[in-house]
């Protein structure tokens, strides 16, 4: 592509560097986190003084052509049911990543518990079917106008809720907003309390888990919403606010369909995160220009 070549600064074909040099330079750019730093600077320079209504968070799968790192599972020790015997001490349950993050103050501390190694992920899609993939996950926070503010890369086997607090914490530092919008995968009082602590209003969908009563209640609410939509009636304010969460799904679509994040051939978390960061930066600038015009 002659136009692209000239735009990149190479007038003649012979000026284009070799593939090996491209690879070395990209490795250096990835190590320096050029894309991530540029994205942070852009948000700081042009979006910091804007008040946004919503911050929607979600994670999307990132399939990779890489072998997953084997995780050694602890041998299961069967526990005796009932109360412990007199003088018997039982080991307390290991707290989840989210529970450990609750008492941490910095994003760096929180992310120290999150793995970036290639893993095997399993997620339920919008149709209720489970999808399995090898690779990682991209966790993003998006504000009004489909503008991504924060992006964090993790292994595929990391639960969405494990990156919720770092996302909220980082986004709150960068811009001002009112509502935190998240799906049922983030249903936790720890996340709600953290959001309120930063003066936001959390709107998080309920995860029924194994409760039949909750499942029936959620189904009734969904049926009611459909009737309201058919009759074109005004729904509750919370429903209206929560429906804005679709903007994070649109950004995931832009990244994969328009900005080259659907097929990543690099290996290693640093390079993969850099590719995704360039995509996030492009979407951020593109959508910000739309908002201005």
Short names for language-model regions:
Residues 1-37:
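Short, positively charged, Gly/Tyr-enriched micro-motifs
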Residues 1-2, 143-146, 260:
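Short connector loops/turns at beta-strand edges and beta->alpha or beta->beta junctions
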Residues 8-9, 48-49, 173-174, 238-240:
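Short hydrophobic "helix-edge" motifs at membrane interfaces and signal-peptide entry regions
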Residues 16, 20, 185, 271-275:
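An alpha-helix initiation/capping motif
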Residues 23-197:
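Polybasic low-complexity intrinsically disordered regions
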Residues 184-257:
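Helix-centered, glycine/charged polyanion-binding patches within enzymatic domains
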Residues 230, 234-293:
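Basic, amphipathic alpha-helical segments enriched in Lys/Arg and hydrophobic/aromatic residues
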